[in-house]
Each structure stands twice: as structure tokens, then as C-alpha cells.
Amino acid sequence: MGVQVETISPGDGRTFPKRGQTCVVHYTGMLEDGKKFDSSRDRNKPFKFVLGKQEVIRGWEEGVAQMSVGQRAKLTISPDYAYGATGHPGIIPPNATLIFDVELLKLE
């Protein structure tokens, strides 16, 4: 499957991230059963990453690249685009499909 992007609320429809730009996002990560494993919103601190530098999982690289500034979307990410057979011990089980609620706040 890779990554499926479903818009929760639209962005400006014009400003899309490009490789090398810093994406500033708020997110909540959940397992398929709805169990939350991480949230920048809970920390009240947006998360930043540089698109194309492999600082995040492949599902984020490809999913966030399809979003425009201001957009909030549900990213459903298959294990091969997330943490695969290894998972993330103690947090994400092996072969887990992940669901992220991501809002692209701005680009830097």
C-alpha cells in the first residue's frame, strides 16, 4: 500500500514542500487499534524535519510531500513504509500499519 493520504481539512492548495525544505508539522501517531504512541500536540511543540534527508519514515517523506501548507491529513502507512518487521521495540510492534494525523503548519 505504501502511504494513503486522506484530507481532514484542506491547505492552501498551492504551497507544497520541496526536497531540502524544512517541514514544520503537528502530528499524532496511532496504531491501527487507535492506541496513541506519540504526539507533538501533547508536547505542545511542533516537529521539524527536512524533506528528502531520510530523517523520517518513508511514509512521511511521501505523504507530507503531497500536502499543502495548512492541510491536515490522515496518513495510513503500511509497515514497509514505516518500521517494517523490526518495529520500534516497546512502542511499535513488528509489521504494524501506522496512522498519523498530520498538520503541515509551515515550511522553512
From Swiss-Prot:
Gene3D superfamilies recorded: 3.10.50.40
UniProt keyword terms in alphabetical order: Acetylation, Cytoplasm, Isomerase, Membrane, Rotamase, Sarcoplasmic reticulum
Protein's cellular compartments: Cytoplasm, Cytosol; Sarcoplasmic reticulum membrane
Gene Ontology molecular function, alphabetical: activin binding; calcium channel inhibitor activity; FK506 binding; peptidyl-prolyl cis-trans isomerase activity; protein homodimerization activity; SMAD binding; transmembrane transporter binding
EC number: 5.2.1.8
N6-succinyllysine, modified sites: 53
Biological-process GO terms, alphabetical: amyloid fibril formation; cytokine-mediated signaling pathway; heart morphogenesis; heart trabecula formation; muscle contraction; negative regulation of activin receptor signaling pathway; negative regulation of protein phosphorylation; negative regulation of release of sequestered calcium ion into cytosol
Its biological purpose: Keeps in an inactive conformation TGFBR1, the TGF-beta type I serine/threonine kinase receptor, preventing TGF-beta receptor activation in absence of ligand. May modulate the RYR1 calcium channel activity. PPIases accelerate the folding of proteins. It catalyzes the cis-trans isomerization of proline imidic peptide bonds in oligopeptides.
Protein's UniProt name: Peptidyl-prolyl cis-trans isomerase FKBP1A
Organism (species): Bos taurus
